[in-house]
Amino acid sequence: MTGAPQVIALSCGEPAGIGPEIAVAAWDQLRADCPFVWIGDPRHLPSSHPWQPVSAPAEALQVSADALPVWPLEFAGNTTKGEADPQNASGVIQSIKTGVELVTSGKAAALCTAPIHKKALIDGAGFAYPGHTEFLAALGGVDHVVMMLASAALRVVPATIHIPLSAVPEVLTPDHLRRVITLTDRGLRDQFGLTAPRIAVTGLNPHAGEGGAMGQEEGDWIEALIREMQTEGYRLTGPHPADTLFHAAARARYDAAIAMYHDQALIPIKTLDFDKGVNVTLGLPFIRTSPDHGTAFDIAGKGLANPSSLIEALRLAQTMAKTRQP
């Protein structure tokens, strides 16, 4: 991303969760080499840490060494750690919108989002989206995105996400999987700088169906789709048995894996690097990362929150911004 300041916009997320405290902890570690501007109500920040208002993300380059750069918003509700106040819903939503506006206008290089509490947004503002990602897709004007979980050890995309396991075979159609593969390939090229990304695709069933003995989807259409897309230039392999795809030697043979359902994708990455996994949304017209955890109401304000995932999300956003192809 040339010509734009390499400053990340960080939306505040749910103020009653751990978002504000891990933002400050991330600033403590990143202030010198990964500047970001926190978008939220400064009253929600830990009182002992310095912050300074900014009116443009580029100002963070001068401010960050001494204070957390803040794009100040005023929230309506009170904040008690661990207890979401629906009156703050409009402020949380505005923080996300402001982050998107800063990135799409070229004033910030990428967007990182702290965790939200969906019920509070529904109760307080009639939030009409299944989640954070769908809201960002609407703001970005796109119909389809994919979720990638990334760490130093693994990049993995679940082809289906928050649906019952019993519904996966119905949702997982050839058109759906083709779209997931296409968006993953494009994201690896455009946002990760890979010129010819290697993608490994798992099977749906145990042992990738074992020739039809343990399921039909692989033989009926998954293998045929992979072969068809190979002829179109995609560097795909599979369908692989998922239980042998995530050990170290196997991971060396691909740049990203596509798994068929939520747990098939998330168990390996959380086993390999639980604290440093990053959620990346591919398919948006801007870079978006987020920490791979929720609001953690149970530990908010107790000095127990681990900022590692947010730190990695900010670092990855910066790296992606430097390598992104327009």
From Swiss-Prot:
Catalyzes the NAD(P)-dependent oxidation of 4-(phosphooxy)-L-threonine (HTP) into 2-amino-3-oxo-4-(phosphooxy)butyric acid which spontaneously decarboxylates to form 3-amino-2-oxopropyl phosphate (AHAP). It is an enzyme of class 1 (oxidoreductase). It comes from Ruegeria sp. (strain TM1040). It is found in: Cytoplasm. Pathway: Cofactor biosynthesis; pyridoxine 5'-phosphate biosynthesis; pyridoxine 5'-phosphate from D-erythrose 4-phosphate: step 4/5. The active site is located at the dimer interface. The gene is pdxA. A divalent metal cation binds at H162, H207, H262. Substrate binds at H132, T133, K270, N279, R288. This is 4-hydroxythreonine-4-phosphate dehydrogenase. It holds the Pfam family PdxA. Belongs to the PdxA family. GO terms for biological process: pyridoxal phosphate biosynthetic process; pyridoxine biosynthetic process. One of its GO terms (molecular function) is magnesium ion binding. Homodimer.
